[in-house]
Amino acid sequence: ILVLDDALQSYNVYKNISIYVYDSIQSFGNRLLVPSGPLRESVKNAIRKSQIFFLINTEVCNDLNDSHFKHILKYKIEINPEFKEKKLIAFAGLGFNKKFFDQLKSENLNLVLTKEFPDHHQYTVDDIFLLLDQANKNDAFLITTEKDHVRIPDEFKSSVGIIHGEIVSDNNLGFTTEIEKYI
């Protein structure tokens, strides 16, 4: 089994199943395609090519009626209890960094600073030195996502805390059963 992220438009890869994930926080933006908007292809085409369609962040869904969706997904983060007692500097290189930072704020963490990097950023020694300098100046601890932590130079990994996250279905059995139909 091979799972690809952002591969809906990869026509040179044979797929047994395509799963379209709609994030109601990001929405469809202005509904225009790159470079004029956030979409890589029209919503209509993406839905037509997908066997499963998921909605995440349902609490802010304004664009769509959730009756169109087979399963509802939510992204949950797991906060180390030690982080709740510390001043924190969070950094991330995600497609939508603000969502990650907002989730941390909703957990009432003491964020003294957030630092955004481009999606899939490969952290350099200089990046981490600058972050550690900010942490020292603010008497704070660095935290980031699991996705970002693996891209930190090895010698700095122990200096950065990890925020674990997972996407969970409203019905894990249903989710698994639906995917198994195509395997």
Report the location of each language-model feature.
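Phosphate/Mg2+-binding loops and adjacent switch elements
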Residues: 1-68
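Acidic beta-strand-to-loop metal/phosphate-binding motif
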Residues: 55, 141-147
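Short, flexible loop segments at boundaries between secondary-structure elements
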Residues: 118-121, 158-183
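A short, acidic, amphipathic alpha-helical segment used as a generic capping/interface helix at domain edges
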Residues: 122-138, 147-149
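Short, high-confidence coil segments that cap the C-terminus of an alpha-helix
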Residues: 85, 137-140
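Conserved beta-strand/loop subsegment of P-loop NTPase cores
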Residues: 18-22, 47-57, 69-76, 82-91, ...
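Short, charged/polar "capping" segments at the starts of alpha-helices
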Residues: 59-65, 98-99, 149-153
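Redox- and metal-dependent alpha/beta enzyme cores, enriched for Fe-S-associated oxidoreductases
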Residues: 83-125
